[in-house]
C-alpha cells in the first residue's frame, strides 16, 4: 500500500509541475517574479529564526512587500539586457522545478517551505477576493457555451469524452488523494489541538470550492476559440479550423505569446487579467495583472510541489526503513538527501518525457485512486472503532 501511494504521489507531482512549466517557459517577467519568492522566503525564514524571533507581523509586512516589488520590477527585468538570464525553454524550467523540489524537501521546514507557503497565503486570499469583487463590478459575459461539440470526444485539449474525463480533469475539485496525503501528513504536525481540524479541513474545502467558481467564471468569459488556442497544441488547433479573436491583442498587451500554453494556468491568468483590465482606469495595466495572476497560480501550485515532495520523501524513508533502520532517522543526512533526490528524479523524469495531454489524465486517475484508498481505509478505521454511524459522513478530508 505504501509503495502504491508513493507511485500515485509521484504522478501527481508530475501533473502539477507540468502546469507551472507551461506557464513560465520563455517568460522572463513571470520567471523572475515567481522564482524571486524563493530567496525572499529564505530571508524571512532566517529573519524569524535568528534575526527577530517571534516577530511574525514584521516578517509578514517585509515579505509581502518584497513579493509585490518582484512583480512590479518584473517588466524592467524583461526589458533589460539581463532578460536572457531569466528566459528558459520548457525543458530547462522542468529541470529547475525538480531541483527546487529537492531543496524544498531536504531543507528544514522553517527555512523555505513554511515561510514561502505562509507568504503565498496572503497572495492567494487577496487575489481571489479581488477577482470576486472584479467579477461583481464588471459582470463579464460568459462566452463558452454550456455544451460544446467535444463532449463526445475529439476535443482540442483532451481527446476523451466528458465522462469520465471531467472527473480526472477537475482533479483537486473532485475526490482528491493528494489532499488526503497532506491532511494525514504535514497538516497534523501544524495543529496545536484537535479543535482546529474542523475549521481548517472544512474551511479549506469551502475555500477551494469558491476558488473553483471564480476560475470557472474567469476562463469561460474568454472567447471559446481563444481558450482553445491557449490550451491546445498547434497541430490540434489547426486541425479543427479554429480562429483566434482577442488573443493576439491580449498577447501584445501582455508582451508574451499566449498561444499553445496548455495546463490551465495561462488561460486562467488571461481570464483574470481580462476581467481586472475592465475595471475603471485599469485597461493599461493588463500586463501587470497577467503576471500577477501567473505568480498567484505558480505559488499556489509550487506549494503543492514542495509539500508533496517532502511527503514523498517521508514515505520513501519509511519504506526503506524496513530494510535499513537508519532511514527512519529524519536527521540522517544520506537518507534525507538521497530520498529527496530520488523522488525529484522520478517525477522530474515523467515531466520531461510526457506532455499535458498524457500526464494530466494519469495524474487525475492516480489522484482519485489515492483518494479512494484513503476513503476506504478511513471508513474502515471508523467502523473498527465502533462508530459505524459516522461512516456515512466520511469524506475526502477524513
State where each predicted segment sits:
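Hydrophobic transmembrane alpha-helices that form the core helical bundles
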Residues: 1-49, 59-84, 250, 260-276, ...
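Loop-to-transmembrane helix boundary motifs in multi-pass membrane proteins
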Residues: 2-8, 201-210, 262-264, 283-293, ...
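Selective recognition of specific alpha-helical transmembrane segments in multi-pass small-molecule
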Residues: 5-13, 65-70, 121-142, 195-226, ...
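Membrane-water interface regions at transmembrane-helix termini and the short interhelical loops
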Residues: 15-26, 39-58, 71-85, 99-119, ...
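Hydrophobic alpha-helical segments and their helix-loop junctions in multi-pass secondary transporters
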Residues: 45-49, 65-95, 103-105, 125-151, ...
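Hydrophobic, membrane-embedded alpha-helices of multi-pass small-molecule transporters
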Residues: 89-107, 133-140, 152-193, 200-202, ...
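Extracellular/periplasmic helix-exit of transmembrane alpha-helices
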Residues: 135-151, 206-271, 307
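Conserved small/polar residues in nucleotide/adenosyl-binding loops
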Residues: 398
Amino acid at each position: 500500500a505504501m509503495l502504491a501511494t508513493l507511485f500515485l504521489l509521484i504522478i501527481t507531482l508530475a501533473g502539477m509541475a507540468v502546469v507551472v512549466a507551461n506557464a513560465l517557459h520563455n517568460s522572463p517577467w513571470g520567471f523572475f517574479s515567481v522564482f524571486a519568492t524563493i530567496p525572499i522566503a529564505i530571508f524571512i525564514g532566517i529573519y524569524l529564526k535568528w534575526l527577530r524571533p517571534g516577530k511574525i507581523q514584521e516578517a509578514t509586512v517585509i515579505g509581502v512587500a518584497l513579493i509585490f516589488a518582484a512583480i512590479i520590477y518584473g517588466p524592467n527585468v524583461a526589458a533589460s539586457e539581463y532578460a536572457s538570464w531569466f528566459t528558459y525553454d520548457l525543458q530547462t524550467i522542468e529541470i529547475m522545478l525538480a531541483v527546487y523540489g529537492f531543496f524544498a524537501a531536504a531543507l528544514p521546514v522553517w527555512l523555505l517551505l513554511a515561510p514561502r507557503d505562509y507568504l503565498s497565503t496572503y497572495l492567494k486570499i487577496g487575489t481571489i477576493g479581488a477577482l470576486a469583487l472584479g467579477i461583481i463590478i464588471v459582470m463579464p459575459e460568459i462566452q463558452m457555451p454550456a455544451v460544446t461539440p467535444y463532449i463526445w470526444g475529439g476535443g482540442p485539449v483532451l481527446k476523451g469524452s466528458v465522462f469520465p474525463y471531467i472527473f480526472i480533469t477537475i482533479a483537486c475539485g473532485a475526490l482528491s488523494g493528494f489532499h488526503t496525503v497532506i491532511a494525514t501528513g504535514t497538516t497534523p504536525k501544524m495543529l496545536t489541538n484537535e479543535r482546529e481540524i474542523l475549521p481548517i479541513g472544512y474551511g479549506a474545502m469551502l475555500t477551494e470550492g469558491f476558488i473553483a467558481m471564480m476560475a470557472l467564471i474567469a476562463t469561460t468569459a474568454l472567447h471559446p476559440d481563444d481558450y482553445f488556442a491557449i490550451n491546445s497544441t498547434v497541430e490540434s488547433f489547426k486541425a479543427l479550423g479554429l480562429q483566434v479573436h482577442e488573443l493576439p491583442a491580449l498577447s501584445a498587451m501582455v508582451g508574451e505569446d499566449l498561444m499553445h500554453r496548455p495546463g490551465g494556468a495561462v488561460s486562467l491568468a488571461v481570464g483574470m487579467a481580462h476581467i481586472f483590465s475592465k475595471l475603471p482606469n485599469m485597461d493599461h495595466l493588463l500586463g501587470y495583472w497577467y503576471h500577477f495572476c501567473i505568480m498567484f497560480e505558480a505559488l499556489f501550485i509550487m506549494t503543492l510541489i514542495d509539500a508533496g515532495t517532502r511527503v514523498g520523501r517521508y514515505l520513501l524513508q519509511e519504506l526503506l526503513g524496513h530494510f535499513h533502520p537508519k532511514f527512519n532517522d529524519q536527521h540522517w543526512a544520506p537518507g534525507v538527501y538521497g530520498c529527496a533526490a530520488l523522488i525529484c528524479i522520478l517525477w522530474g523524469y515523467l515531466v520531461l518525457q510526457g506532455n499535458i495531454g498524457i500526464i494530466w489524465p494519469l495524474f487525475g486517475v492516480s489522484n482519485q485512486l489515492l483518494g479512494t484508498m484513503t476513503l476506504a481505509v478511513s471508513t474502515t478505521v471508523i467502523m473498527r472503532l465502533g462508530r459505524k454511524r459516522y461512516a456515512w459522513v466520511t469524506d475526502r478530508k477524513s
